[in-house]
Amino acid sequence: MAADATGASAATGAAKTPGAADAPGAAGGTGAAGAAGAAGGAGGAGGAGGAGGAGAAGAGLHSRHRAVLPDWLALYYDRPIEITHGEGRHVWDAEGNRYLDFFGGILTTMTAHALPEVTKAVSEQAARVIHSSTLYLNRPMVELAERIAALSGIPDARVFFTTSGTEANDTALLLATAYRGSNQILAMRNSYHGRSFSTVSVTGNRGWSPTALSPLQTLYVHGGVRHRGPYAGLTDERFTEACVADLEDLLGHVRPPAALIAEPVQGVGGFTAPPDGLYAAFREVLARHGVLWISDEVQTGWGRTGDHFWGWQAHDRNGPPDLLTFAKGIGNGMSIGGVVARAEVMNCLDANSISTFGGSPVTMAAGLANLSYLLEHDLQGNARRVGGLLIERLRAIGAGAAAVREVRGRGLMIGIELVRPGSGEAAPEAVSAVLEAARGGGLLLGKGGGHNTSVLRIAPPLSLTVAEAEEGASILERALHCA
């Protein structure tokens, strides 16, 4: 099995958590509600170890779904499940089956399902006022912006709230192109940045980029995928040197671009990452050309990688990015996204703007409560500790599975790449089979990867306990026999 793509073990090294409180004790003691105590959790019909498929009610809802929603709207499983409620790290479907959630609604339920602190904040704010728009002063929005600006690491930071990661990246691209007077963008191969007209055009993954039409001119560079491509066989140092040389050569052939947009760890691309320091080396080159750096932290932010609060901190030798985008986990399920940028860049637009739904009082209240819980309970530290143990356990499992090419990741952002044994070819059919088998065993996973969707993605809530990590690994070990 190939070596870890990220280098050093995820379980080692001091965490960089700006402003976080000390950990409250053992990894399991995160204080989340309900099922936080043990792997068994609250008992629901079906149990975690033997979830059944969708019944007649589920089949009927699936038929209605297909009748009124787009064909291109992806659904997991041959018989899709309807999730009706959740608690801690578990969710239940309409048939009463309980599942251990190792994907968190695409890395969005970051803290825990039904976290009392968040539901209380949402309920209390909704009872006062749900909506006002950005035309009026909004105390929760200002307070959350202040906290995020302080945590961002960007000097003289300004924050603009959106409702999704797509919209956040779209806004960052608008700011960068306006500031630089250029519609040319550098992006990474195998990347994903959203589903809007501008963000699909900077997405370097054809499975998620349905059109080549674009308001931007996009140039793709090497570096996001460590163990595939022309530089895969190089050492980390030589890999970085080759990618920097490629960037230098590219910039010598084009007019100066507006920005480079990059995920520190590629999310939809299969949780793959370059060697630490690559984007710092890129930044040195970009700075000479006046090109901005946008760090897409939609999936990597808020301590998920364990070692760092932001993904860009693994590449911080030459300072923070010019712009940072975020979404998903900060709302713990509420629709929050946003952009952080230094004031000079954020204030470059010469026209008025508003946001009708971005920064709504209810979502901001959720974000404040969730961020406070995250920091007070040191969930970044929990991600580092429990994630490190989980990665080691999965590597041990993978060492005995011919279909496993690589187990990679940091913290609670883990990818398992599957191949056809003996060939090294991507095995999307094996990923689908394991996904189904894991669901049957009571475990929800994600999938991704630019090479024909050949990666299992593991990203549970950051309050995951050691017992739950072991439970999930055991279910996955059995499911891998289907690969």
Show the residue positions of the predicted features.
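Small-residue-biased low-complexity repeat regions
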Residues: 1-56
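Conserved N-terminal phosphate-binding loop of PLP-dependent enzymes in the Aspartate aminotransferase
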Residues: 2-3, 55-483
